């Protein structure tokens, strides 16, 4: 089995070269341990199909690939027919680092799909040991690499990745295309494998690199959630932030309670102050009326005093002029009805008479009132008499004030008339 000569199991011919005298038996992988070809010209087939054709029509060439994919000196081989009678072609072998050999083969499907060859075409690259794309080597006669088909004839366009997870899209068992998010490779490289379930359903998974290299994907940090708080939760079982929040809330509630109690205490005083506002307003209005009346009386008094002063000034000026006339030697004072000095005495006499008449009328009114008071028994009290006298005094003061105003107006008119005379001006 491992290179020893034996009778073939499936009808393969095991012949030896009579010229060389040595027989090169093929091992399990149709080569020696490291892929070096033997010097036998006539190969002996293994149990899985020799040169006459295996169970699935694969051809076992005598020469095997070397360690680095170099083309060995192979003898001619006779291809056999496969299970369905198709003439297969030699399959390209990959070297250790993915270099492609010169004879590509497009394997056939299970149900013997036609495998055509065209001249010329490029050979399909195969994956190396580390997933590197094998370099295509040109040859004189090439055939196109046929796409491998799945079990039911579906197109299988996926390629496998290398050791360090280069891109390799895969398909499902039934040939359906499926996608899978990028997974991390051995050293954290981003890969694009697409995996699926047994029936072609999309299986989106994401793995972590073996050495935890950085990946270009968003990371979500889940914050620790606070424990659930219910009626049976104790204060000591809460965290520090929740305890601080509860303490601040308790202080705020206590301060609001104190403020409410203080307002409740001051509520009676505030109510009294509010109720006293209308009374205070009425008192202020009454005092305002009194002040207004006093201001009016004072204004009248000032006007009266001003008129008296003006009148006295006019009289003093007239008197000084008359004295100047008498001081002049040989001068005589004219006696006429329009003499200012005569007018002065006439006005003074008239004013005195008016005042005497006013006083007499006032006294007469008082006598009449007093007689009425005396004849009324219920009004004989001293308080009623005193009140009556005070009211009469106010009346007299108002009348005298008014009389003084009229008198001042008359005097002003007289002074203006007297100043218009030639000898006074």
UniProtKB/Swiss-Prot annotation:
Please give the organism: Schizosaccharomyces pombe (strain 972 / ATCC 24843) (Fission yeast)
Record carries keyword Plastid:
no
Q: What is known of its domains?
A: Contains FG repeats. FG repeats are interaction sites for karyopherins (importins, exportins) and form probably an affinity gradient, guiding the transport proteins unidirectionally with their cargo through the NPC. FG repeat regions are highly flexible and lack ordered secondary structure. The overall conservation of FG repeats regarding exact sequence, spacing, and repeat unit length is limited. FG repeat types and their physico-chemical environment change across the NPC from the nucleoplasmic to the cytoplasmic side.
Compositionally biased tracts (Gly residues): 47-56
* Record localization: Cytoplasm; Nucleus, Nuclear pore complex
Q: Where is the composition biased (Polar residues)?
A: 1-10, 28-45, 72-89, 167-207
Annotated stretches, region: Disordered: 1-207
Question: What is the role of the protein in this entry?
Answer: Functions as a component of the nuclear pore complex (NPC). NPC components, collectively referred to as nucleoporins (NUPs), can play the role of both NPC structural components and of docking or interaction partners for transiently associated nuclear transport factors. Active directional transport is assured by both, a Phe-Gly (FG) repeat affinity gradient for these transport factors across the NPC and a transport cofactor concentration gradient across the nuclear envelope.
Q: What are its GO biological-process terms?
A: mRNA transport; nucleocytoplasmic transport; protein transport
Keywords on record: Cytoplasm, mRNA transport, Nuclear pore complex, Nucleus, Phosphoprotein, Protein transport, Translocation, Transport
Q: What is this protein called?
A: Nucleoporin nup45
Which residue positions does Phosphoserine occur at? 289-290
